[in-house]
Curated annotation (Swiss-Prot):
Modulates cell morphogenesis by regulating cell wall formation and assembly, and/or growth polarization. Together with LRX2, component of the extracellular mechanism regulating root hair morphogenesis and elongation. Residues 353-362 have a biased composition (Basic and acidic residues). Glycans are attached at N73, N79, N255, N269, N320, N346. Residues 1-28 form the signal peptide. Induction: By ethylene. Pfam families: LRR_1, LRR_8, LRRNT_2. InterPro entries: Leu-rich_rpt (IPR001611), LRR_dom_sf (IPR032675), LRR_extensin-like_regulator (IPR051582), LRR_N_plant-typ (IPR013210). It comes from the Eukaryota. The gene is LRX2. One of its GO terms (cellular component) is extracellular region. This is Leucine-rich repeat extensin-like protein 2. It is found in: Secreted, Cell wall.
Amino acid sequence: MLLFPSTSLRLFFFLFLLFSSCFLQIRGDDDDDDISDDNIKVDPSLKFENPSLRQAYIALQSWKQAIFSDPFNFTANWNGSDVCSYNGIFCAPSPSSPKTRVVAGIDLNHADMAGYLPRELGLLTDLALFHLNSNRFCGEVPLTFKHMKLLFELDLSNNRFVGKFPNVVLSLPSLKFLDLRYNEFEGSIPSKLFDKELDAIFLNHNRFMFGIPENMGNSPVSALVLADNDLGGCIPGSIGLMGKTLNEIILSNDNLTGCLPPQIGNLKNVTVFDISFNRLSGPLPSSIGNMKSLEQLNVANNRFTGVIPSSICQLSNLENFTYSSNFFTGDAPRCVALLGDNVVVNGSMNCIDGKEDQRSSKECSSPASRSVDCSKFGCNNFFSPPPPSFKMSPTVRVLPPPPPSSKMSPTFRATPPPPSSKMSPSFRATPPPPSSKMSPSFRATPPPPSSKMSPSVKAYPPPPPPPEYEPSPPPPSSEMSPSVRAYPPPPPLSPPPPSPPPPYIYSSPPPPSPSPPPPYIYSSPPPVVNCPPTTQSPPPPKYEQTPSPREYYPSPSPPYYQYTSSPPPPTYYATQSPPPPPPPTYYAVQSPPPPPPVYYPPVTASPPPPPVYYTPVIQSPPPPPVYYSPVTQSPPPPPPVYYPPVTQSPPPSPVYYPPVTQSPPPPPVYYLPVTQSPPPPSPVYYPPVAKSPPPPSPVYYPPVTQSPPPPSTPVEYHPPASPNQSPPPEYQSPPPKGCNDSPSNDHHYQTPTPPSLPPPYYEDTPLPPIRGVSYASPPPPSIPYY
């Protein structure tokens, strides 16, 4: 009689203890930002080259225990003291001690791993590049990341991270590239983010709310993508302060209200301006005609009224003007002539007399079609009374989003399900993985292409032939290496190499999808089961014994970002997505591929010339590219990472660390190619400290001095053979919060021997492109541009 209740109580008590311990472990990670290796046992028989590699061993072994699923056995060779030979791990000479090798880069893109980030990763204090896009990592970003003082690029896109904005990234002094796309971050965007010297910010496809901070104009970024959130509120008038650096901005599908601030006319370097799928109203400011570099203008699916200003149609560089699904009543004769000027124009579903495909007379006489008084919105964007022709409509005044104290509904938008899982209906559904089905949703984005592609980096001046690193064997080249934004090095003091390498296209890996979506389709990669859904990013690099960097093939649908002088912002050119309400067009942003060798710039510092960016016009200090070589079936040693010599002459393929003090380089100019072509391997550059010719595809660690990074050339690195495997440390980090994956839930393939299956080979697996941005970062879902 008492047996049944007793059994039930025991089961309940056991489950309670299990979840309580997991929660306490997660909270412990959040509250404790200090790291201690006292509880981690290292086999005394293991011999390490230096204390830094011993610390890296502890960090990586702790991380290996925190990975619940590794379907491609990517961590099969994560054994022994030769951490530089681990799959996805890349070493380089330390900037402070050229004879000392340290772990300078991690590239696990497209590894499809499930797990969390243990706080021991903070022991990787020499890390400059950290690329994890297109996996199933969940939980929160550990506070111990604050110890990564040299971290230059952080790409966590297309995973299942949760919680509020990871404020720890605001404490990273060398950070230039931040990509948090396709996760489940929520709450407000901190205003301090726009006070940092960043070059690219990608926050699209999350759950951010409570408006865009008023100090947005303080940011020196060249690429800013906040699309597909639920921000609400007005576009800050401070946007006009970004005219010197901003090249591309995507604010589509953010529930924005109010009128378009006339200060946008100061954005003279912007090539892509996308504010589609919002609730913006009023007239289009004639100041748009001052945006001389504008190529893509998308204001579709809003509530704009009045007449199209003739100044817009006189822009000499305009290639695509989409103003459909508004309430415009007329357009200037010059705009009619655009149809014969090889300019794509879409003005359907408006109230323009004499045109086809317009709204009905009933819709055009509705309250939504009436002109409004922009000064009544309280956006503080207008300093003079509106033109007399515009009267305030009787519609209810739109107020900015509620304060952060209000709760955010977790069902607003469903993130893409893992490749094997189906997506449940939600208000905003992102494209499911190639194998998963997309459930109906209010806002559906096109599924990512079925094939995987690794990001490519735009070509920079050819670096001198990479010197061989005698101590270690050549690093394996990874097939799908994380894309890295290559920043143009300063003008070389010595003659450049005889011929430049093919241009590196900086593209983020797009999620796989059955076929390339139509042009400009903004789709998010599907997440994997368990943790928060994530979109797929570029596949992890396949390691081959060739030291040369792997080639990156952009996803068929999402456009890739080409980098010229500085990391290009993602261009979101998306083909039109199938969702009932067409999602905003995005310009696919591809994350920079990981460079196999990492180079550190010479100790001497010299300011590099300002980079010029074409295509996605993103002006900001270019991040150093890192090269990741493909991996062969057997775990090959990582590619060599080199730090540039202390002398002012350009060191061969050194890895540069960006200067500790943040000095923004001149705004880069990006060209955003609409067509997708396989980009060459992208190098990872660390900004050099000394004056020297910029090498092509080297990895730069920001120099300790405040001078801009110098160019570096890639060096062929031959990593030493990995020693016998030793048991990993017995310490096991607690799982992170918000992570549903467990060893029992996800398939975890344990390989008893190192000769386990090599990482899968991904061919052109694109992430959903972000329409309108051509920045090299983890591949976003591709969406056709309207």
